[in-house]
Amino acid sequence: MKVGVEAIRELRQITGAGLGDCKEALETCSGDMEKAKVYLREKGLSKAYKKSHRDAADGLVAVRVEGDKGAILKLGSETDFVARNEKFRSLAAELVSSLLKHGAEDLSSFSASPYDGGSGVSVADEVVNAAAVLGEHIVLSGIGFLELGGPGVIGSYIHGAVGEGIGRAGALVALEATTAKTEALLEFARQLAMHIVAAKPESVSVETLSNDIVEREREIVAKQVEALGKPESVASKIVDGRMQKFFEDMVLLEQTFIMDGSTKIRDLLHNKGQDLGCEVRIVAYRLFSVG
């Protein structure tokens, strides 16, 4: 089948593969973008195995932390012009404050909850009202709410800030630590949130990474290694080695800390625990970005 130039360019942007390879992949996969990505991975032409955290054309991420609770959300817009609008920024700030105050299990329940801005409508209706005023489609596309169940801290970070707690990307991370909240622990949590924004992990640990993701990657790697024509014993070791590199990219505890370029996050937690005289553990994190 014939595929459009825009689809080829989009696939190239996602995968980093050449235009010709992207065209071949899309034609082979009948224009299916997801299948084309897998096709390129199997050919060893792409490393784009991470899902995107950037599904809005534009917009803002808003974060708020207060005590043992933290909230984060992504408010999408069609253009940067609207994302920079004061009403849009105010809406993002009001929504994340409401999320922090009331909490929510998921996007659906939060959207159905009353809007705190005094208009007497639901969160979803207020977003629709804002879209009518601003003149383009606006969507509340993701939320995250973390609350500590014991001693610890919640850290946050905003990248590309355009206001307090509002920017182009953001993360929350909850740390469990059996010690008093100190400036050192809070700063450590902030640094971890900064790392999460930059490194974009898919899970905290190997055990919590989706089995479907792991098995799909193992199948792709096995096909890549099979093409090398190595003996089975050698091929098996190559597959294991490539899977370890996969985990080091996808899993937070296996990643290398961006601020020193050498220490694994799991070792960083151990070292910080020794400094503080207690165990420090990552309970959960939330990450969003736009643009």
From Swiss-Prot:
Belongs to the EF-Ts family. GO terms for molecular function: translation elongation factor activity. It comes from the Bacteria. The lineage of its organism: Bacteria, Pseudomonadati, Pseudomonadota, Alphaproteobacteria, Rickettsiales. Residues 79-82 are annotated as: Involved in Mg(2+) ion dislocation from EF-Tu. GO terms for cellular component: cytoplasm. PROSITE patterns: EF_TS_1. The keyword Magnesium does not apply. This is Elongation factor Ts. Associates with the EF-Tu.GDP complex and induces the exchange of GDP to GTP. It remains bound to the aminoacyl-tRNA.EF-Tu.GTP complex up to the GTP hydrolysis stage on the ribosome. Keywords: Cytoplasm, Elongation factor, Protein biosynthesis. The keyword Cytoplasm applies. Transmembrane segments: none annotated. NCBIfam families: tsf. It is found in: Cytoplasm.
